[in-house]
Amino acid sequence: MWGGRFSAKPAELMQAINVSIGFDKRLWAQDLAGSRAHARMLISQGVIARDDGEEILKGLDAIEGEIVAGAFPFRDEYEDIHMNIEARLRELIGPTAGRLHTARSRNDQVAVDFRLWVREACDRSAAQLEALQKALVAQAEQYADALMPGFTHLQPAQPVTFGHHLMAYVEMFGRDASRFRDARVRMNECPLGAAALAGSPFPIDRHATAASLGFDRPTANSLDSVSARDFALEALSAASICATHLSRLAEEIVLWTTPMFGFVKLTDAFTTGSSIMPQKKNPDAAELVRAKVGRILGSLTTLTVVMKGLPLAYSKDMQEDKVPTFEAFDALELSLLAMAGMVSDLTPNTEKMAAAAGAGFSTATDLADWLVRELNMPFRDAHHVTGSAVKAAETLGVDLAELSLADLRAIEPRITSDIYTVLTPAASAASRISYGGTAPAQVRAQIARWKELLG
């Protein structure tokens, strides 16, 4: 490959630190796709003879067959996937194999391979997110009216519905999917043909190879073409944000399945037991999804630090771009699939959620709103009056709705018995009719919108 310049073999330690076939063999399909596109372009442009090009293409087909069949001899001595394929091609068709590397460097070769892989990973993630959204929408539709407490600071705040709560995650995951689609648009430029860094003196057609590989256009600067890894950083950023959202939902599932909450149940399919405590049914799938954000965010940090301070153009440091990216998307894909399964699997305890919906004086804001609406009281004054009512209820050990009219009038004489119509969790939730609110009609509107968007 590059032995003409050297008079001695590299040290074993050099070979050990340099070899990457153990992980970059995952790029075999992308490497073959790039090589086919390059070979066809070389034929079309008359850079290599058609007979030679056809022989190369047949050899690449044979290599694909070997890899698919598990018969391809991946070898450490050839360092990486590119040279493993080229060496095998030479074994199959002879010296003609060497013509494939005309007007190409491993620098632009790995750049196109990696872009293709990351592009496919973004497409898979967006599709898996849509599957998760559909699972959430299905549950939300079934429980659009089911009351539960809404929380701030993990303290009861205001009544909401279970459907409304789930639809919040549909929105988050919708933004995640759009981030992957947006990243795909920016990365969809083809670096093939940039060669080592300065471009090629051969009459190549970079637009043709870009089109044949599904790119929108070739990259516009050869130095940037082989230097850039921001497409992977952007994809990892999207993955990290998505994993954060998954972690939040996973945490809630963990909480909801505890006896203290008891809001939902998971079947045996997504839980495990204990080696010593026979009664245990642990939400391990949710806990593992919650933890995966560490691996995924760590991958973003790893690649950011690798790229920080690198001069143009290619440096071997960039070999370290693949493992964190592969690991991050492996973890994300498994997390998305597991979460979709859990969401479909869970069964809410609507009675327990409804009973908890009124806990912690969760209708206090409704009392304040009634004072504003019916007595024309400034909200800050209404807030103070309501706080006094909460204090009185707390002292008596009752809920707001259980305070007598006399108790309430002792705080604000103008209060009438009509106040009791707003102090139930159901009335509270039903009153939130603003766009995007928790009123069941609004929740159903959100569901209808997403069902149309998701198809």
From Swiss-Prot:
It is found in: Cytoplasm. It is an enzyme of class 4 (lyase). Its EC number is 4.3.2.1. InterPro entries: Arg_succ_lyase_C, Argininosuccinate_lyase, Fumarase/histidase_N, Fumarate_lyase_CS, Fumarate_lyase_fam, Fumarate_lyase_N, L-Aspartase-like. Keywords: Amino-acid biosynthesis, Arginine biosynthesis, Cytoplasm, Lyase. It comes from the Bacteria. Disulfide bonds: none annotated. One of its GO terms (molecular function) is argininosuccinate lyase activity. SUPFAM superfamilies: L-aspartase-like. PANTHER family: ARGININOSUCCINATE LYASE. Belongs to the lyase 1 family. Argininosuccinate lyase subfamily. This is Argininosuccinate lyase. It comes from Caulobacter sp. (strain K31). The gene is argH.
